[in-house]
Amino acid sequence: MSQENLDLVRTRLNIVVEAFNARGVDAALPHIHPELVWNAPPEWLESDVYRGREGLRELATSWGQNFDEYRLDLERVVDLGDGRAVALVHQRGRLKGTGHPMEMAVGWIVELVDGQVARVDVYFSWEAALDAAGLSE
């Protein structure tokens, strides 16, 4: 992937994350491919695969019900070529009813199709995502 394409992936992910943080999942959906495949980590307690925009809405609703506050922060994007990249994403929030802070760094392997996020494979660590992508730090 050229620097131009890496910048495109980073820009698209920033748009999705910023829309989600400001206005919720529905604001992010126009930037999500209609045939999205979102693969949760194997350790995930809910469904392991979410499909399409409705699937992403289901995931956001299910996960979001655990928090009074929740946001994503895109920290880093690494080129994988062929419209794919690894993203380091920090999840931050306050657990519902307790006020206790939660922070967790996760890795996403992301693929864009027609400028939209079409696939996300989620890993519970940056290192696991890099390993799955055949990279290491």
Give the role of each language-model region.
Residues N66, G93-E103:
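Short, cysteine-centered beta-strand-loop-beta hairpins and adjacent loop/turn segments enriched
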Residues N5, T11, V25-G83:
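A solvent-exposed, acidic/Ser-Thr-rich amphipathic alpha-helical stretch
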Residues I32, Q91-G93, W108, F124:
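Short beta-strand segments enriched in hydrophobic/aromatic residues
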Residues G81-Q91:
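A short hydrophobic beta-strand element
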Residues R84, A105-D131:
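Short beta-strand edge/turn micro-motifs at domain boundaries
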Residues R71-D73, P101-W108:
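Short, surface-exposed coil-to-beta transition loops
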